[in-house]
């Protein structure tokens, strides 16, 4: 399992303090080959001596029998997504169209650009296209 997936699973299941600093400090004092294997940057392929049991316990309590995290069982996670989808389908703020705001910004930028271009001829004696 990749380290990002593992930490996301720990975050959602509530086991944030599973790997403490003592397990990393004890794994960093070992030899170079074992510290390479057990460092968190290389995907937890080796097991640190202090944190292996904690990791196993948190995975077992977090995973469903099918092997996937039980993120869909929490009704609190589903309600905001459902309301957001409904909000996208129905216009939430009908008085302020988003397209009109974008057009105003685009016109302001284009008007400014035209004003800068039409300011007048170049005052340099050699011309505007001469590299500095």
UniProtKB/Swiss-Prot annotation:
UniProt keyword terms in alphabetical order: Plasmid, Signal
Q: Which range is the signal sequence, renumbered to this chain?
A: 1-17
> What domain of life does the UniProt record list for this protein's source?
Bacteria
Listed Low complexity bias regions: 25-39
User: Region Disordered: which residues?
Assistant: 25-79
Its name, as the record gives it, is Uncharacterized serine-rich protein YubK
């Amino acid at each position: 399992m990749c380290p990002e997936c593992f930490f996301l699973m720990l975050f959602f299941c509530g086991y944030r303090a599973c790997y403490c600093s003592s397990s990393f400090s004890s794994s960093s004092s070992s030899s170079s080959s074992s510290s390479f294997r057990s460092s968190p940057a290389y995907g937890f392929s080796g097991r640190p001596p202090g944190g292996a049991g904690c990791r196993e316990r948190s995975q077992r309590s977090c995973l469903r029998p099918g092997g996937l995290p039980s993120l869909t069982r929490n009704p609190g996670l589903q309600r905001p997504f459902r309301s957001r989808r409904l909000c996208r389908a129905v216009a939430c703020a009908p008085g302020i169209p988003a397209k009109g705001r974008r057009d105003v910004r685009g016109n302001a930028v284009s008007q400014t650009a035209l004003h800068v271009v039409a300011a007048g001829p170049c005052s340099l004696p050699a011309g505007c296209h001469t590299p500095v």
